[in-house]
């Protein structure tokens, strides 16, 4: 009798619309809650997945409010165990956190050229540091038993998680691909242990 080789099936999900999104602010570690629209987005996605018969074994989320609330809504609807991991927080964008575009341009002007090692907002992380952090969290998932995992997080760190799985490295001045995770956008990844290969099996850019 044939057996299915073990695999990790991982869904990377960005949070619903936050107050920071609605006000067009740089969020980073600034802790904005969901808007009513964001809560509706999370509820609608949970209902969609439930109707599709989609099953997860475990959920992991950033503890920042916008991700926490999204994860709690979905975990409650799908009866999922949920843990919070601070290493799944968004990019630390330093002095830019919470500022709108105009405020950031005045207080923390962007350098003319950014290497992968340039810190955001003068005191924050670089994209390279975020890439390494994402790689550690992806490895943490693979260190767990094969199964179906949901990760609820943020657009920046999820892009770096995708980079890690697809063998892409950050480039200077944001060259390279960008995965457009809209609010409640998600990517489904599969890691085959027999071949040590990752596959992107589905992408939905959300709202």
Q: Which residue stretches match the model-derived regions?
A:
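Phosphate-handling substructures
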Residues: 76-136, 190
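Domain-level recognition of soluble alpha/beta enzyme cores
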Residues: 169-197
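Short beta-strand scaffold positions
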Residues: 61-62, 132, 152-153
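Glycine-rich phosphate-binding loop signature in dinucleotide/nucleotide-binding domains
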Residues: 52-55, 141-147
